[in-house]
């Protein structure tokens, strides 16, 4: 059984504010160069996982470009040690377990609602940003077979 996202109004509100404020402390400037347009579809954000900043920066991009309800897939063992993240939109995946199928079904369900953004880091673990080869875990793309509507990626 997976741990589903349970947005709590205060934790989610705080996370959104914190994700907007925190990068400004450590980065001189954040510039989004994009010609991406919001098509009004649910959004799937896929990225390489190179730092603990990734989730915050994904929410920062979400706020600037899409302003959807944030959901992020996390390894269950990491989520269990930081359960407050569940209240900000984190849900679990357990690598190598049959419950992965349930996680993919849940992700597809989230992507059925155009008000949602789903963030995933298919590398599984944090890797150096200097790695020249980015390798995603196998199977994550099967989730898309379960999505019945168009999705913006």
Name what the model sees in each region.
Residues 25-153:
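Soluble catalytic domains of membrane acyltransferases
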Residues 1-26, 80-88:
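Alpha-helical membrane-targeting segments
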């Amino acid at each position: 059984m997976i741990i589903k996202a349970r947005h709590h109004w205060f934790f989610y509100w705080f996370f959104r504010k914190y994700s907007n404020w925190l990068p400004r402390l450590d980065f001189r400037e954040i510039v989004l160069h994009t010609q991406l347009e919001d098509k009004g579809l649910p959004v799937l954000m896929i990225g390489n996982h190179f730092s603990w900043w990734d989730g915050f920066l994904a929410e920062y991009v979400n706020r600037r470009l899409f302003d959807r309800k944030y959901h992020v897939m996390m390894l269950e063992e990491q989520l269990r040690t930081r359960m407050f993240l569940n209240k900000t939109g984190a849900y679990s995946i357990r690598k190598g377990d049959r419950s992965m199928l349930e996680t993919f079904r849940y992700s597809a369900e989230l992507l059925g609602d155009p008000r949602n953004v789903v963030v995933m880091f298919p590398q599984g673990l944090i890797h150096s940003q200097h790695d020249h080869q980015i390798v995603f875990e196998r199977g994550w793309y099967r989730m898309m077979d379960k999505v019945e509507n168009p999705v913006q990626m």
